């Protein structure tokens, strides 16, 4: 995008001051998008042209469902319409797009998840296996915690220490978890 319409208008130069967030959760009932990422605010190194605003729209769907199965061009058109409906951008502001489908992006906590400890105990028997990130740990860690599991693992490997137990303890502190019912 050349410009966001949100917040009285924002271009790449003043984006972080007007919208400091990396992502925005969307709860509007008339759109399907669940989260909007502003890649410029993650790091300027993620954006090839510093005069452009790179955003990502995340849709929480199931692999193989109707939305997942849309051709890329139709999905892009849908997303651009939603940007307009939310007042983020005008269709003419969109310069480029890419569609990425991430299967199993979020762990599922149903079925036999109550037996997860048996799986963890089994994989712990492999001395050279470090389970990291959401998919590796089958745990809903936020991005910071997911990256931290990898960083702690790499540090331990480089130092010759077995830190697999430490890795499993990342993001187990209660203050980091949302609670229902406030």
PLM features: residue spans?
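FAD/FMN-dependent oxidoreductases across multiple families
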Residues: 18-21, 30-45, 92-129
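C-terminal lid/capping helical subdomain adjacent to the catalytic/cofactor pocket in oxidative enzymes
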Residues: 100, 110-182
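Short Gly/Pro-enriched loop/turn and capping motifs at secondary-structure junctions
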Residues: 62, 104-105, 136-138
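Mid-domain catalytic core of redox enzymes
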Residues: 1-73, 77-88, 122, 165-175, ...
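Generic alpha-helical propensity signal that fires on short helical segments
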Residues: 42, 51-54, 73-77, 106, ...
